[in-house]
């Protein structure tokens, strides 16, 4: 079992964020000690790595929770949906970059 400090050091996720994930039910510690310390097993750390992956894809925490709480969730479908959203965002950003370039040429 790993303490919240250990998990924080391993993953780079702050202790505050780990506590927040616990508060919102996204990542519950495997065990609480009598003193109230959070302990995590390897399975919980693996789940945290999945959460980190989804966050890297800019998936909101509420959606990550829905995905992970659904026993029948389709990881591939979730990734396809996020890919589509990121492509739309990229297209918007490309449009903004083109606009800025045009404005700069006019200066």
Where are the language model's segments positioned?
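Basic helix-turn-helix/winged-helix DNA-binding cores
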Residues: 1-66
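Short, charged amphipathic alpha-helical surface segments
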Residues: 52, 65-107
């Amino acid at each position: 079992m790993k303490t919240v400090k250990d998990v924080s050091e391993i993953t780079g996720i702050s202790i505050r964020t780990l506590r927040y994930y616990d508060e919102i039910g996204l990542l519950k510690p495997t065990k609480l000690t009598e003193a109230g310390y959070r302990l995590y097993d390897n399975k919980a750390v693996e789940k945290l790595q999945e959460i980190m992956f989804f966050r890297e894809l800019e998936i909101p925490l509420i959606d990550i929770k829905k995905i992970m709480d659904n026993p029948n969730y389709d990881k591939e479908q979730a990734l396809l949906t996020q890919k589509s959203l990121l492509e739309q965002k990229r297209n918007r950003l490309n449009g903004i970059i083109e606009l800025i370039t045009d404005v700069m040429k006019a200066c």
